[in-house]
Amino acid sequence: MKKLLRGKKACDPASHLWLKKKNGTMTRGAVKIGEGQYGKVYRGCIDDGCEKYIVYKEIKTPSLSEKTNNLPLAGFKKALEEMNPKMEFTIAKKLEGFGVPKMYLYKTCDKKDILYSEYVKGKELREWMRFQPTLLAMKSVMLQVIYNLYRIQKKYPGFRHHDLHLGNILVRPVPVKDIKFMGHTISNAGFEAVIIDFGFSAFPRIKNPLINANNYKNIGISR
């Protein structure tokens, strides 16, 4: 991993990652798995055996017109102008071990930034629920989210996610094991809950213009 992300290589991931074709053969490259207003998300393998995946997001630098288009609130416009995607990476990096994806690297390149992170092979909670999981599995997933938020609060009392909904919780299959929580034990039922998307989060000593300036109150988000 360190060799892959070293130096200029990190600015051209598609030339160094591996992609498995439908016929099973391997080639250099990555596949796009998502796209937002300011960036595209890709997945690739770090070895030619495709035993481990990595995800990276290429973030273009938006122009002023792109940032402020259809945004009538002056304060919200200013916040978007100041917002740095690296802030979200930094928050997630500090929360490693608390049920969030592992962050690998934030690389500033020519005309774009690239964020490398762990690939979470799972489904959004709202989609996972459509497959009618068992009552034990549903209880376990909810407990995992609550437990990890509790653990985060113990270490970082000032943390607030501010945007924790069914689309920002991923559920992935894992080996069955027991979870101990405040004197109680419950099975994970073969699933792990992963909290994502910290773009609206508040974190001690990390400035988030969307939250620190109270602009979230104007866009339907409350503490």
Task: Indicate residue ranges for each PLM-predicted region.
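ATP-binding glycine-rich phosphate-binding loop
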Residues: 5-48
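ATP-binding glycine-rich loop module of kinase domains
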Residues: 30, 38-94
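Activation segment
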Residues: 61, 122, 172, 176-177, ...
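Conserved structural core of kinase catalytic domains
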Residues: 67, 79-82, 87-89, 93, ...
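Conserved kinase catalytic-core helix
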Residues: 132-162, 166-167, 172
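C-lobe/activation-segment region of protein kinase-like
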Residues: 184-223
